[in-house]
Each structure stands twice: as structure tokens, then as C-alpha cells.
């Protein structure tokens, strides 16, 4: 029972403390907001008191030799003196006020007290306080020299484009020259399609070695070549040697012939060639020719080269196929 009572007292005390903190925070915030709300009124009152005090001081002051001596100097000194005096923030005199100095304005009695002493430097600063900002002083001798300076200002602005226009006039024929006649390109003559071609492949030994004659003979016979005309090997339509020859195999060394007894024979390589057009489908014959070259290269340990005796690439194979298609189209 005592523990429950103690717990209740702790909770009630915590709630009371929180309520006091919230009340104190709310009260301070309310006082602060009221303080900021009353501050602009105090500023306005203080400004009005300062303005009234300045007016009283100026009315009490007399016109002495010092003030007359300052006006007799150049007007720039008077303007600098006016700029040095602090003015209220709400005073503002638009630039167009000096352009209309002759408009009749009814001034309050305070401004008419010293009518004979217009050169006083204090009047231009205090007069805008007693009258609207857009009403100028009709008797300000310092503002008169400004009006004749406004008229000559636009003259050089309007006269500036004239020499610019004259400068551009002689450049008109240069800016728009007549286009020179462009010679028409000569018509490109279509390259005549070839009507026949020879596709060449090479099977060569690695650099610094030669192909063995006995291994070469076995691989040639396994690829379906038969020794025949011109002492070279031919691949016929039929493996038994019947039918027209599709492509042939010759020695890479001149004169390119072979000796059927090739046990003691060595050579750096052999050349396989096919003449297009040939019997049957030339593209199928080309595939068979490529397979035969790869088989011989694998058996003798050589490599397949193109007609320039460079390593065969897929791009070169596509070039061979394009040549075959071109010949077929020319003979169609």
C-alpha cells in the first residue's frame, strides 16, 4: 500500500513540475511577443521626439557669418554638408523632384519663418520632413544648376549610333560576298564486277621449321586429294576422283609440283586454291576447301594462312565470301 502511495505521489509531483515548466515557458513567450510588438511604437515616438527637438534647435539658432560663409563657397561644399547630417530613414526625395522647381507649393508656417535666408544648408534637410517627398522647394538655388545638365545628356547617346552605322556601311559588300561556283563532283563510275577470281589459302609450318613429306602425304590423302594433272593434287566432286575438280593443292615452293614418293620430301608449306566460278555451289565448295586446309594443318602441325601468307581471320573469310558472291552475281 505504501509503495502504491509513493508511486502516486511521484507521478503527481512530476505532472506538477511539467505544468510549472510549461506555464513558465508560455508566460515568457507571451511577454517577449508583447515586447517586440510595442517596440515599433517606441521607435516612432523616439523619432518624432528627435525631429521636434531638431526643429526647435534650428529655430533657436540665428543666421551667423558661418552659415553665410559656407553658402558663398562652391555648391559642392553645401551638398557635402547636407550629406553628412543624419536624416531619418523614412525621408526620401525622388530624383524627379529637382526637375520641377517652379510648381507652386503651399508651405507650412514653420518653413516660411526664414524666407530671406534661403541659402541656409539646414532647410533642404528639414523641409522634406514637414511636406510630402514629392513636393520640391521652389526657392532652392542649389538645385537650379542640375536642370540644364539633364538636356545635353541624351545628345551623345543619340549621336553615338551614327558613326557606328557609317562604319558598317563600307562592310556591306564584304559581309555578303557572292558564293563562288562549286564544281560538281565528277560522277563516280561503278566498279565493274569481276567475272572470275581465284581463292587462295596456305598451310605452312611454323617459323623456322618445315613440313614432313610422309605426314603431309597422309593428311592430303585423308582430305580427299588425288594426285593428277600438272603433278599436283586435286579435290574432285567424288572422293574416288570422279567428277570435276573443285579445288587443287600445290607445293608452295616453285615450280609447285610434287613427287608421289614423298618419304624424304620436306617443304615450308602447301597452297590450296579454287577458281571461281566452279562446278556446283561455290560457297559450299569454299567451306569444303577451308575444312580440308584446317585438317591438313592439324595433322602436320602447321597453321592456315591467307593469300598474303598472314594468319587467317574471320574478316578475311568474309572477304572471300563477298568475292564469291560478286562473281556469282556477275555471271548470273
Curated annotation (Swiss-Prot):
It is found in: Cell inner membrane. It holds the Pfam family ZipA_C. Residues 99-115, 123-175 have a biased composition (Low complexity). Keywords: Cell cycle, Cell division, Cell inner membrane, Cell membrane, Membrane, Transmembrane, Transmembrane helix. Coiled coil: none annotated. Interacts with FtsZ via their C-terminal domains. HAMAP family: ZipA (MF_00509). This is Cell division protein ZipA. It comes from Shigella dysenteriae serotype 1 (strain Sd197). The gene is zipA.
Amino acid at each position: 500500500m505504501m509503495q502504491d502511495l509513493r508511486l502516486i505521489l511521484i507521478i503527481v509531483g512530476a505532472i506538477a513540475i511539467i505544468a510549472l515548466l510549461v506555464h513558465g515557458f508560455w508566460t515568457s513567450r507571451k511577454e517577449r511577443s508583447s515586447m517586440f510588438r510595442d517596440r515599433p511604437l517606441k521607435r516612432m515616438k523616439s523619432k518624432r521626439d528627435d525631429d521636434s527637438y531638431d526643429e526647435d534647435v534650428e529655430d533657436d539658432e540665428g543666421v551667423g557669418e558661418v552659415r553665410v560663409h559656407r553658402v558663398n563657397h562652391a555648391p559642392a561644399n553645401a551638398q557635402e554638408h547636407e550629406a553628412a547630417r543624419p536624416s531619418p530613414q523614412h525621408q526620401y526625395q525622388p530624383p524627379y523632384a529637382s526637375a520641377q522647381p517652379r510648381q507652386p507649393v503651399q508651405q507650412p508656417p514653420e518653413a516660411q519663418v526664414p524666407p530671406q535666408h534661403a541659402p541656409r544648408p539646414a532647410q533642404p534637410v528639414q523641409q522634406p520632413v514637414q511636406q510630402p517627398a514629392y513636393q520640391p522647394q521652389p526657392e532652392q538655388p542649389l538645385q537650379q544648376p542640375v536642370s540644364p545638365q539633364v538636356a545635353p545628356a541624351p545628345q551623345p547617346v543619340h549621336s553615338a549610333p551614327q558613326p557606328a552605322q557609317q562604319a558598317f556601311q563600307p562592310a556591306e559588300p564584304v559581309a555578303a560576298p557572292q558564293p563562288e561556283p562549286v564544281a560538281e563532283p565528277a560522277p563516280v563510275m561503278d566498279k565493274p564486277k569481276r567475272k572470275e577470281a581465284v581463292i587462295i589459302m596456305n598451310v605452312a609450318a611454323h617459323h623456322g621449321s618445315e613440313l614432313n613429306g610422309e605426314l603431309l602425304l597422309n593428311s592430303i590423302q585423308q582430305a580427299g586429294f588425288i594426285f593428277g594433272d600438272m603433278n599436283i593434287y586435286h579435290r574432285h566432286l567424288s572422293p574416288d576422283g570422279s567428277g570435276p575438280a573443285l579445288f587443287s593443292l600445290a607445293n608452295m615452293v616453285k615450280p609447285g609440283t610434287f613427287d608421289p614418293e614423298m618419304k624424304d620430301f620436306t617443304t615450308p608449306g602447301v597452297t590450296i586454291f579454287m577458281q571461281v566460278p566452279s562446278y556446283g555451289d561455290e560457297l559450299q565448295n569454299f567451306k569444303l576447301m577451308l575444312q580440308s586446309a584446317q585438317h591438313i594443318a592439324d595433322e602436320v602441325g602447321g597453321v592456315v594462312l591467307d593469300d598474303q601468307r598472314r594468319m587467317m581471320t574471320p574478316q578475311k573469310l568474309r572477304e572471300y565470301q563477298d568475292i564469291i558472291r560478286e562473281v556469282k552475281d556477275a555471271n548470273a
